[in-house]
Structure formats: C-alpha cells, structure tokens
Amino acid sequence: MAEFPASLLILNGKSTDNLPLREAIMLLREEGMTIHVRVTWEKGDAARYVEEARKLGVATVIAGGGDGTINEVSTALIQCEGDDIPALGILPLGTANDFATSVRIPEALDKALKLAIAGDAIAIDMAQVNKQTCFINMATGGFGTRITTETPEKLKAALGGVSYIIHGLMRMDTLQPDRCEIRGENFHWQGDALVIGIGNGRQAGGGQQLCPNALINDGLLQLRIFTGDEILPALVSTLKSDEDNPNIIEGASSWFDIQAPHEITFNLDGEPLSGQNFHIEILPAALRCRLPPDCPLLR
C-alpha cells in the first residue's frame, strides 16, 4: 500500500473492547500505516488529544464513536489556530451514527478506517449556537429532542434507531409542543412546534430524514418545523413521505434566531442545550473532512 501520513484515532471509551477494530488497526499498521490511538474517559479529552495530534504532526484525527464523539472532535478541530490543522476522519461506532450514515461512511471497519486515513479531505461547514456550542450534523427541538435525550441506553443498544420511536410512543401522554418564534434570512414563523430540525446534515434520531435537502458545504442551514395538534401523526410523518404535507414548514438561511416564552431544549448532535433564546449560524468551510466520492451531502 502507498505511504500515507500518520493519523490519530480518538476512540470513545465505550468501544475499547471492540476486537474487530483492534484487528483492523493492527492489520493497517502491518501494512505500514502509523495510527496512534487515544481513548476518551471524560468530557474534554478529545480537545486534549487534538492538541497532542498537532504536536505529533498527524494529517488526520479520526473520531471513533457516534455523533457525540464526532461533534467533540470536530469542535476541537475548528478551534485550532495556525496552519497544518489535521483533517477529520470518521469511524462510526455509535448507536445511530446519523452523520456517518448520511455522508455514506462505509459500515465495514476496515473500509471506514482506510477512508478516514486516505480519503479526499473536503472543506465542510459546521454550525454554532450562541457563539459557543457547535454541531456538525443537526440541532433538533421539540418532543423529538426529549425522546432522544431520555431513551434508555439499554434500549438504544438493543434496538438502535427504532428505540427512539418506541420510547416516543411510550411517552406520548407527557409530550407537548413548544411555542416559539423563528427568524432567518427571508424567513419568519411563530407558533407551536412539535419538532424543529435545523440541519447542516440531513438525518437525526436514528435515521429520520428531518432536513432531506441539507448540504454540508453550501453555507446554509436547512430548517424544518413539524406543526400540528397531535403528537402521534407528527411522529409517524417522520417515517413516511411528506410531500405537500401542510404540517411541515421549511426554510433555508445562514442563520436562525429562536425565541421562546419558556425554556426549550435543543439536541446538538446528541448533547442537550436548554434556554429561551438561540442564535444558530453556519460556519462556512470550518474544517476538512475525509469523505467518500459518492457523498450525497456535497453540492
């Protein structure tokens, strides 16, 4: 195999006993690739490992985990200053892997690793909330956020993305819409939202296409609001074709402002953020990511 620059894999601590991954890394090392491995234990580890990666001079930092791990690693990368900032590689090892799935990262570990190390590095956007928290995939609000936040880990491990739907059905009696006002470029809406999706990527919640037209390098955020009087039809509508659905409001903008009379919660790549005021803006070409040539989220 041709020579490739060194990489550093930041592995979510939950995946340390993954024997096939260990074997795949050993095989690539035997082929001459330099792959450093670091394991996260607590929040902040990824940022420290990215600093170490820069000192090692690696070309790629690989996020090994789910959407939360990808978020933490990509956030640390965009905060780097100077030249020679490593590209982001993705090794999907989480429950839902929404971002990795939507950009067509291979499911096979060996293929995903090779792409993360040797794939083309393409500039992609990220999004920032209130000038602080970032997300690479999607911000979701409404009852969907509460479902994904509260779904038990054992249920997610057993059933994957379907677990969110099952838990949502179990919680329907306590889920209410969120009243809010949303503004963007040439966009204004106010009312009761059952689900809010603001996407740099397209899917969340274990495979639900909340923002099916989103692209990760167009400098825009895609917005979708699901409205209606009943929770169950809205939940079901995310599973089927929604063409000409009167309960769906759509918009696109480089920024959105959300105001609510009460505290609401957004889920940012799996991390909850609560408040009454949110300013969400796109950060164009914020980092480079190694993606497959058939990635459908590129313009």
From Swiss-Prot:
The active site is at E271. The lineage of its organism: Bacteria, Pseudomonadati, Pseudomonadota, Gammaproteobacteria, Enterobacterales. Residues 2-133 form the DAGKc domain. ATP binds at T40, G66, D67, G68, T69, I70, N71, E72, T95. The keyword Signal does not apply. It is an enzyme of class 2 (transferase). InterPro entries: ATP-NAD_kinase_N, Diacylglycerol/lipid_kinase, Diacylglycerol_kinase_cat_dom, Lip_kinase_YegS, Lipid_Phosphate_FormReg, NAD/diacylglycerol_kinase_sf, YegS/DAGK_C. The gene is yegS. It comes from Escherichia coli O17:K52:H18 (strain UMN026 / ExPEC). GO terms for molecular function: ATP binding; lipid kinase activity; magnesium ion binding. NCBIfam families: lip_kinase_YegS, PRK13054.1, YegS/Rv2252/BmrU family lipid kinase. Belongs to the diacylglycerol/lipid kinase family. YegS lipid kinase subfamily. It comes from the Bacteria. This is Probable lipid kinase YegS. Probably phosphorylates lipids; the in vivo substrate is unknown. Its EC number is 2.7.1.-. Pfam families: DAGK_cat, YegS_C. Its main location: cytoplasm. Mg(2+) binds at L215, D218, L220.
